[in-house]
Regions:
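Structured alpha-helical subdomains that flank or immediately precede key functional sites
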Residues: 1-544, 549-554, 561, 569-573, ...
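Acidic carboxylate motifs that coordinate Ca2+ or other divalent cations, activating on Asp/Glu
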Residues: 520, 562-564, 592-594, 629, ...
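Extended alpha-helical assembly domains of large eukaryotic scaffold proteins
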Residues: 550, 600-603, 616
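Short, flexible domain-boundary/linker segments around small modular repeats
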Residues: 552-559, 563, 618, 628
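Hydrophobic, ordered structural segments
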Residues: 558-562, 567-595, 599-611
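Amphipathic alpha-helical scaffolding segments comprising HEAT/armadillo-like alpha-solenoid repeats
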Residues: 615-619, 648-650
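Strongly charged, low-complexity linkers/loops
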Residues: 617-628, 640
Length: 675
């Protein structure tokens, strides 16, 4: 219940504007300005109790307390490492970022790309902090985390060994913004070791709030050059790299002066007239300096002598940048990563802005964790979303009528769980064309038969998923306006009037009731429990742990028209009729004859009983009524249906104008919640 309330509160806060870069959420409820002011007034340096200078902040395995790698580690402030520490000297540059004893080169490549865009860097590294007059041993950074920006406060105690920084450091040794940024990112993810291993796209997204794509250039699509130009026109960040095949390959320099395993930035793409034909060129920047491409189209190559003067004016390169032909680029580089930025990140009006939609959801065993296509009987249970694209792209180089969009799917908080033995799941998505009969409809969750008979139109990379629990964030970026929303069943119920009056009860049932009810001719919840459990105990075709007193109270509350907390003859007959109907549905949907229902079978049984429910409601029902092995026995099935029917009937009774909403004061809400 607390988790559901927290989710609702978070959604409302985001809708109110919290979680933007300008109004970031205070991570761990720590307020940078307040904490700094407190330290300055007290004359002390900040020590962060939420990410202490202690072994648990380093790691859990290779950087764990008993690892040789962490022996002799001391946490020191920059002032203890050099006489004149600086936060940023002369602007953030590539030489500020040197890798230490941590496998987070993916993160460093993303940080290096930040240095190429001052506006983006300023969103991650807020101004107004350093080692000057207001120094108090406290710094803060901002990261995008699954749909919201968080402001992360740290102290400046950094792990060192033999007097040197253990992890990221600057080449000069007196500049500390990159080391402090890495520490803040480690805090968000639980510890330093949690940062080991990853992709630059993850860093791109966390530093920009954008959506990242990755292309293997040996399998580049035929329109790769157009994709690059379109990305540059939209102000995207583009990074490229050459894969390494062994540890010895790392930082190896090719014959034409390209460095393997390092991240480059792609900053331009043009076509020039060259010897009577069009030549495609790309401009690449080496954030690591030192070496630069010496092949065709490099700075002093002869190819430039055959380019029109007008074209040459439009083809410029700054220091550290070089041009190469697009074909050479595809041949030498292994991977291209594109991060499309959100409109609020782009300050230059010349860039084309994309339209964005974001949804947070989850996979839960038994309800919405349907797994991959290898699980055809549950695949349909996965969360579904419908995307409607109405406007054609503005693309003069493309004669096809089409609408471009990018889908990004990220799983939440998995790095933080590494400390407890968890890791990333393999996840993915598939895109299907909406059947014509469902055009214009949104409240439709496509069923198993659809996915058994229709092929996907596009998908993410192949993945194997065993239907694990997890939380995710789905985003859709499109060039033109689009509509994206969950594709879910509406909440509705067909509640049949099964009321049996006293006069309609036959003599046989009347005699049975007289025997069961006793002198007062009424059945209490406790008596109902005894009756129901005697009946189900005789059946071998259904499994049950027996009806609980709580379930029997729900039954009585639903059937008790008089309000005395007991069932009379007609009320008991109505209940019995209802239970018999539920038993028929239960048996019908127990497809394997096991005596229990699986959670997918329960979903179909609920529909047959007259209830259509959203994924979120199914998650709650499975969490409440399923056994540990994700099966539903008969008593839990009846309990679920009884509570659902009672809640629907109460709501409909209060919603007199059938508006779909009701208003309750706190006392009324408590009254109904405690039924």
């Amino acid at each position: 219940m607390a988790g559901i309330a927290s989710t609702l509160a978070k959604k409302r806060a985001l809708a109110a504007g919290f979680g933007t870069n300008a109004n970031a959420v205070k991570y761990m409820n720590q307020d940078f300005e307040a904490l700094r002011s407190q330290c300055l007034s007290q004359g002390g340096l900040f020590s962060d109790p939420t990410f202490p200078a202690a072994p648990q902040s380093l790691g859990f395995n290779e950087l764990g307390p008993s690892s040789y790698k962490t022996r002799g580690v001391q946490w020191k402030r920059p002032g203890e490492l050099c006489s004149n520490p600086e936060f940023i000297v002369g602007g953030a540059t590539r030489t500020d970022i040197c890798q230490g004893a941590l496998g987070d080169c993916w993160l460093l490549a993303a940080i290096a790309s930040l240095t190429l865009n001052e506006d983006v860097l300023a969103r991650v590294v807020p101004s107004g902090q350093g080692f000057g007059d207001n120094y108090a041993g406290i710094f803060h950074f901002q990261f995008w985390q699954f749909g919201e920006w968080v402001d992360v406060v740290i102290d400046d105690r950094l792990p060192t060994k033999d007097g040197e920084l253990l992890f990221v450091h600057s080449a000069e040794g007196s500049e500390f913004w990159s080391a402090l940024l890495e520490k803040a990112y480690a805090k968000v993810n639980g510890c330093y070791e949690a940062l080991s291993g990853g992709s630059t796209t993850e860093g791109f997204e966390d530093f920009t709030g954008g959506i990242a794509e990755s292309y293997e250039l040996r399998r580049a699509p035929s329109n790769m050059f157009q994709i690059i130009r379109k990305a540059l026109d939209s102000g995207a960040l583009l990074g490229c790299s050459i894969d390494i095949t062994s540890a010895a390959d790392s930082e190896a320099v090719t014959r034409q002066k390209l460095v393997k395993g390092h991240a480059y930035s792609l900053t331009g793409a043009v076509e020039v007239n060259y010897r009577g034909r069009k030549e495609k060129l790309v401009r690449v920047r080496n954030p690591w300096g030192q070496v630069e491409w010496t092949g065709a189209w490099s700075d002093n190559s002869t190819e430039w002598n055959y380019v029109d003067a007008a074209d040459r004016q439009n083809v410029k390169a700054d220091d550290g940048e070089f041009w190469m032909s697009f074909q050479e680029f595809l041949r030498h580089y292994s991977r291209l990563e594109i991060c499309t930025l959100t409109p609020d990140t782009l300050t230059d009006d010349s860039f084309k802005h994309w339209s964005i939609c974001k949804y947070d959801s989850s996979w839960r065993k038994g309800s919405t964790a349907g797994g991959c296509r290898n699980h055809p009987h549950t695949f349909w249970m996965n969360p579904q979303f419908v995307i409607k694209l109405d406007e054609e792209d503005d693309d003069p180089d493309d004669n096809e009528v089409g609408c471009s969009f990018v889908v990004g799917l990220i799983q939440k908080n998995r790095r933080r769980l590494r400390k407890v033995g968890e890791d990333m799941h393999t996840i993915g998505f598939a895109i299907y064309e909406v059947p014509s009969q469902f055009h214009g409809q949104r409240e439709v969750h496509l069923d198993k038969n659809y996915f058994l008979t229709h092929a996907q139109k596009a998908r993410s990379e192949t993945f194997i998923n065993l239907r694990e629990d997890g939380d995710f964030c789905l985003r859709v970026f499109s060039e033109k306006q689009h509509e994206t929303q969950p594709c879910d069943d509406p909440i509705d119920a067909t509640l049949n009037d099964e009321t049996v009056s006293d006069d309609e009860v036959d003599a046989g049932f009347r005699g049975l009731f007289t025997k069961l009810a006793g002198p007062d001719m009424e059945i209490s919840a406790a008596e109902l429990k005894t009756i129901m459990n005697k009946i189900v105990a005789k059946r071998t075709d259904i499994k049950t742990d027996g009806f609980s007193l709580e379930t029997c109270r729900v039954m009585v509350n639903l059937m008790d028209d008089s309000g005395n907390g007991k069932l009379g003859l007609g009320e008991f007959a109505t209940l019995w009729k209802k239970v018999q109907r539920y038993l028929g549905i239960y048996k019908k949907n127990d497809l394997d004859g096991s005596g229990t229902m699986s959670t997918p079978e329960m979903r179909m049984a609920l529909k047959e009983a007259g209830f259509t429910l959203t994924n979120n409601i199914h998650q709650i029902l499975v969490a409440r009524y399923a056994e540990g092995d994700m099966t539903i026995d008969f008593d839990n099935f009846v309990a679920c249906l009884m509570r659902l029917e009672m809640m629907f009937r109460v709501f409909k009774k209060i919603d007199t104008d059938d508006s779909g909403s009701i208003e309750l004061d706190f006392h009324q809400w408590l009254t109904f919640a405690m039924i």
